[in-house]
């Protein structure tokens, strides 16, 4: 099937949405589909986007600039994307997270709209509602059951929507191609890892409190924009905390084996870059699945949305995000219990390989949709609705 993937953000970038988009295009290509990605030009200096993200396939990427960072600019770019789609070989399916691009191209082919939050910023108001009512809408993909329920409620006037729930995913680790990075700190103490952005609501303050309470452990935080790293480093001052800053996604797998325990201390309100959105109710964090793919023992926040994937005492330990005593006890106990670490990590990896790979997700989100000449995509890994 010929798939046009429409992304309103930039490639390459240091944002998580770029990782998600590139992984999905890679997985669609691995499944035998002919994929072209339409994106905005890169906002991060990387000569080779494929190498930067560590994807296995070199699908075409067409960069379409945003003339100005306003709704009018987004619409002008969307019309340019539509012109390119109309001039190229017609796609069998348009897929994406860009409501402007999908709305502009809705008459060209059936389309799938993937949602990661309920957006309040699409202009003019009603654009998304009209998109969801279009006769060529084939499916809505939501990353969590919580989001699917809220999204359906927000658009209840349209009646039942064709929503499929497909969580984020991770790839099984590839064989290492380079030596593991040499980490600062003490070589003979347990290493606690966090991988991800340093935005408000990600629990960085909780990590620093744990580091203060447990001076016998070293804490390594991988990721974060320069300004966020500087803000947290400036308020830290602990000798057992190390901020490593942003790393290309392709390099992250080399860090995971160094960590004895990994943390996902999300708070009840989780913010995106610049506090432009609050997504804690609906999150499906890619870092959790990457932790799982590497078989690392996880301590995560006990939040309803995370319980869609995580099970306390089975594939992780869950603790309330606002109870640092419980986190400190759990971390100290897990560090001291090698058998429990192995059991949690092994089960997390088993579940990842069985349920949450990008290839499985690619098959699931396309299952049953019309393909070339009206054929249906195979239902090999069909997902349930919500």
Question: Can you describe what each PLM-predicted range is?
Answer:
Residues 1-46, 89, 209-214, 218, ...:
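N-terminal subdomain of nucleotide-sugar transferases
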Residues 4-6, 141, 170, 174, ...:
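Conserved donor-binding/catalytic core segment of Leloir-type glycosyltransferases
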Residues 104-105, 122-124, 130, 134-162, ...:
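A short, active-site helix/loop in glycosyltransferases that binds the activated sugar's phosphate group
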Residues 202, 248-290, 300-308:
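Nucleotide-sugar-dependent
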Residues 333, 340-355:
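A short, well-ordered alpha-helix in the C-terminal region of glycosyltransferases
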